[in-house]
A protein has these predicted regions:
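Hydrophobic, regular-secondary-structure patches
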Residues: 1-44, 51, 87, 132-133, ...
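Residue-level detector of beta-strand face positions
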Residues: 33, 96-100, 183
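Mid-to-C-terminal secondary-structure elements
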Residues: 51-65, 76-176
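Non-transmembrane, solvent-exposed regions of membrane trafficking/translocation machinery
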Residues: 67-69
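Intracellular coupling helices
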Residues: 209, 218-229
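Peri-transmembrane interface segments
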Residues: 158-159, 175-209
Length: 229
């Protein structure tokens, strides 16, 4: 059987893992032909919550990202990638303009850029509650994106992963011996490697007397995200 997440799973994780949890966001995937005036193209839709900006390190170029008010009131607001704005609006300011997609009209409230490359900048973010409403008031979600508190470190992150997996298996009635069912991609291993690399690099840089350079390197360890699906 297919394991599905819904809004109640989000609340359950928040209620039971406050010790570890920094932020959490659902993610629902969709695709749509997005149109503005005479221009249109097919884009990837990601329906998320405001904390998704933190998890993805999305950089706002214009306007703003989603707010809790957008989620609560299921607003038809859209945050579009830099290349979406370039495709549809060219030199026109997209903020406050309306685009059509999936048979509905959406107000553009922000434009973002992403270091992940062109593919990430051809994405449209919308409130997850708005997409759920469009999809016949379903509360299903595809993935849950979580970040853990930096102070728990690598050991705490691994502990969090193990406890979260067991919690979700119990919640979804999956056998404890079932290696599948729940998939968690934990980048804590990347964090550990980055910290070890940064520590080694710090020793080298300190030895040659230019320790100030390390400040720009340690930033790579700021990847602390689980993907649960």
């Amino acid at each position: 059987r297919r394991i599905e997440f819904d809004n109640s799973d989000l609340k359950a994780i928040i209620d039971n893992f406050d010790k570890y949890l920094e932020s959490i966001s659902p993610r629902i995937y969709d695709y749509a032909d997005i149109k503005y005036k005479h221009k249109s193209n097919n884009y990837s839709i990601r329906a998320v919550s405001p904390s998704h900006q933190y998890n993805e390190m999305t950089i706002m170029m214009q306007g703003r990202f989603l707010h809790e008010d957008d989620i609560t009131n299921k607003k038809r607001h859209a945050v579009i990638g830099r290349l979406v704005a370039l495709d549809l609006f060219e030199d026109e300011n997209p903020i406050g303009k309306y685009i059509d997609g999936s048979g509905h009209t959406w107000k553009v409230i922000g434009v973002f850029q992403d270091d992940g490359g062109d593919r990430e900048e051809r994405i449209v973010y919308i409130p997850y509650t708005s997409l759920q409403k469009i999809k016949k008031n379903t509360d299903k979600i595809d993935e849950i994106i979580l970040s853990y508190k930096p102070e728990i470190g690598y050991v705490g992150a691994v502990e969090f992963e193990q406890k979260l997996k067991q919690f979700l298996k119990n919640r979804k009635a999956i056998s404890p011996t079932d290696g599948g069912g729940i998939y968690i991609r934990n980048v804590a291993d990347n964090l550990k490697q980055n910290q070890e690399f940064a520590s080694l690099l710090q020793l080298i840089i300190t030895f040659i007397g230019i320790g100030t350079l390390i400040a720009g390197i340690i930033g790579i360890s700021n990847i602390m995200v689980f993907v649960v699906k």
